[in-house]
Amino acid sequence: MRLYRDRAVVLRQHKLGEADRIVTLLTRDHGLVRAVAKGVRRTRSKFGARLEPFAHIDVQLHPGRNLDIVTQVQAIDAFAADIVSDYGRYTTACAMLETAERLAGEERAPMPDLHRLTVAALRAIADGRRARELVLDSYLLRAMAIAGWAPALTECARCAAPGPHRAFHVAAGGSVCVHCRPSGSSTPPQAVLELMSALHDGDWEYAESSTPPHRSQASGLIAAHLQWHLERQLRTLPLVERGYRVDRTVAEQRAALVRQDMAHGNHTGQEDLPATASGA
């Protein structure tokens, strides 16, 4: 089979044998691809840091029966240096990469919009111009929209009656009207749903004027909606440092374990791990 080239974001990697690694890539034209990078763990490897998580690369691959083989790599954007130097940026970007892998679906199913969104979001985290918790929540909402799982925010999730509606129910699909509202629905302030809409639509002026309590509530609803559809917890999302105080000692210890998993491959591949997109 012929070699092929593609642009990709490195989602994660893990060890294979004494000198190789298996890398998981979100490519622009071929979707999720897993490939072997031979000799990459040697100190003189020609690939080196180009295949570290968070890297945006131009990669050439040789198709294989089970795993492709990386033959050439060129760096496009080196986001890792700015991301890994800061705990908050690092945990936020980890949550993005895990989400991207979960939403990408089957291997080799093209997801060009998800690829573009992920690159834009990593760029926004690396440059630090916007609040990282807002960038993350915007990314999660838009990524869910690409996958067809976006919560209903301006109409009833069940009957499509135009809103705004006060109630929100994750299993129902988002905001719900008084006639369709299931028991157990939450009733967040209207400003919370408006913030979620702003994050989805890229209205950064509104999003950045929001209050910490509203951001916290919106984050909770977004995370709950995502994980309900994924039918599993994201292992990186609880590590994300947001605007409220965290226990840095415990959180950084937990983040170190995730860093080891992603960078050094202490788990197998079967385990856990646009106009508006440009400003994600």
Curated annotation (Swiss-Prot):
BP GO terms, sorted: DNA recombination; double-strand break repair
Region (Disordered): 261-280
GO cellular component, one term: bacterial nucleoid
Top-level taxon of origin: Bacteria
InterPro entries according to UniProt: ARFGAP/RecO, DNA_rep/recomb_RecO_N, NA-bd_OB-fold, RecO, RecO_C
The entry's keywords: DNA damage, DNA recombination, DNA repair
Statement: the UniProt record of this protein carries the keyword Disulfide bond: no
Tagged with keyword Hydrolase: no
Free-text function comment from the UniProt entry: Involved in DNA repair and RecF pathway recombination.
PANTHER family per record: DNA REPAIR PROTEIN RECO
Family stated for the protein in its record: Belongs to the RecO family.
Name recorded for this polypeptide: DNA repair protein RecO
Native source organism of the sequence: Mycolicibacterium smegmatis (strain ATCC 700084 / mc(2)155)
